Amino acid sequence: MNLFNFFTRSRSTAPVARERLQLLLAHERALSGQSDLAVVLQEEILAVIAKHVSIDREKVNVKLGRDGTVSTLEIDIEMPEAALVKN
């Protein structure tokens, strides 16, 4: 065994860098896709609630959060008094 061959790299750095970049891009795309889903869910949930109860969009508080691999969508809606009274 040649001593110089022992310390040489078997792979060039370009393929390794390409693999790392592909992993980074895939991760970024996955994160951005999830936030788009949360925005769509927010709009659809508000549309369904507005279909059944008259709500003021200015009295709606929406929080989008992310903790590790979990995304959260928190919606606080101030309901009008008439909607809270049972008929």
From Swiss-Prot:
Claim: Cell division is one of the keywords in the record: yes
Keywords (A to Z) from UniProt: Cell cycle, Cell division
Gene3D superfamilies reported in the protein's UniProt record: Cell division topological specificity factor MinE
Record-linked Pfam families: MinE
Entry's Gene Ontology BP terms: cell division; regulation of division septum assembly
Family: Belongs to the MinE family.
Physiological role: Prevents the cell division inhibition by proteins MinC and MinD at internal division sites while permitting inhibition at polar sites. This ensures cell division at the proper site by restricting the formation of a division septum at the midpoint of the long axis of the cell.
Protein known as: Cell division topological specificity factor
Organism encoding this protein: Acidiphilium cryptum (strain JF-5)
